[in-house]
Amino acid sequence: MYMLNESTKEILKKPFGKVYKELPPINRKVNIIAVGDITTKNLLSKSIIPNLSIIDLKTKRNIPVKINHKFKTVFEVNNPQGCISDEAEETIKYISSLDMVDTALIVKDGEEDLLTMMVIRYFPKDTIVLYGQPDEGVVLLTINQDLKHKINNILSMMDKI
């Protein structure tokens, strides 16, 4: 399990990509991963069905979010706040090896925020990842080798228990 520490908390406050106030146009010909309930809900409202949605059914840690969508495949994991559990990492790694569409990974205990790093680590280059930047908008990034390298550096700085 990876755990945040003071140095990685500071690094992770900055978005990994450009922050948009509104959902930007998205290339639908590549894998699309949504991390966060509001991001997922916004994509679905525009009839964009992500290959994978990572959600915990709440926003800002405790406000419930209802997503009116029946995902084709659902996985559930525990992922404590401020951590990346081994269970969550292995599940994302497994999902990345499949050719899945309309899949949900529901974090039933904890939060999903840090799982963006596992998506970047395990999904192929050119995958589009969207995640919410609280009170700012949505971050859109495209996985590339530089981003994978940056994420691996951050993960190496986190506490491993």
Curated annotation (Swiss-Prot):
GO biological process: coenzyme A biosynthetic process
GO terms, molecular function: GTP binding; kinase activity
Tagged with keyword Transcription: no
Keywords, ordered alphabetically: Coenzyme A biosynthesis, GTP-binding, Kinase, Nucleotide-binding, Transferase
Taxonomy, superkingdom: Archaea
Listed EC numbers: 2.7.1.237
Reactions catalysed according to its record: 3'-dephospho-CoA + GTP = GDP + CoA + H(+)
Involved pathway(s): Cofactor biosynthesis; coenzyme A biosynthesis
Annotated binding of GTP, by residue: 37-38, 56, 58, 112, 135
UniProt enzyme class: transferase
Listed PANTHER family: GTP-DEPENDENT DEPHOSPHO-COA KINASE (PTHR40732:SF1), UPF0218 PROTEIN TK1697 (PTHR40732)
Function: Catalyzes the GTP-dependent phosphorylation of the 3'-hydroxyl group of dephosphocoenzyme A to form coenzyme A (CoA).
Family note: Belongs to the GTP-dependent DPCK family.
Name of protein: GTP-dependent dephospho-CoA kinase
